[in-house]
Structures are given as C-alpha cells and as structure tokens.
Amino acid sequence: MKKIAKQMSESIELGIVLAASGGFMDAYSYIMRDHVFANAQTGNMLLLGVSISERNWPEVVRYLFPVLAFAAGIMLADLVRFRMDEKKRLHWRQISVLLEAIVLAGVCFIPVSLNLLANSLTSLACGI
C-alpha cells in the first residue's frame, strides 16, 4: 500500500499542540496581563463593545490594540508567505514560527506596567 505524503502543518498532532499553546497564551494574558485575551479575539471584541457602550475609553484602548495587533500579525504572515521564494532554505511557515518565538520571548521581559504593549505583541504573535 502506497503512503500519501501529508503536510506536517495539517496534522492532528500539530493542531492539538497549537490549540493548547493558544489556550495557554490566552490564560497567561488574561490572568497575568490585565484581563485581555491574546488569541480569542472574539472575547476582546465583546469586551471592546462593552467598553465603547460604557464610554470607558482607557478600556477601549486596552482591547482595541490587541485586536489590531492580531490583524497585523495575520498580514505579516501573509507578507512572509508571499515574499518567500520556494527555493529558499527555510519554508515560510518556519520563518513565521521563528518570528512568533522571537516576539513571545521578548514579551517575557516586558514589565507589568507595560501590559498594553505585552498584550499587543502577544496578539501579534498569535496572528502570525
């Protein structure tokens, strides 16, 4: 029987790892970084809407920036994908994961007083 080659990025095992890491990043950012979700942008959109309706402008900023950073992360991943030539040594997915790791490693050193920056960068990494 002939075995069909499967893209590693489409494996169930990697899907489980990504779901777990996304959940961890949400738990970390919500519990440790001022009640903002890193990965669950629907939750941030809900909290953003509530903050707008209450005219609580500091909270609007707190939820808006991570949502925009997540969108920027998606655009950055697309930019990497489109700019990468197939003949390069690294695949665009590998470069994207490397960018995520660099950003998340940097977030570890951001103090709690800069939660808006930390949450925005974490959301950027989740968007990649």
Q: Where are the model-predicted features located?
A:
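Alpha-helical transmembrane segments of multi-pass membrane proteins
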Residues: 2-128
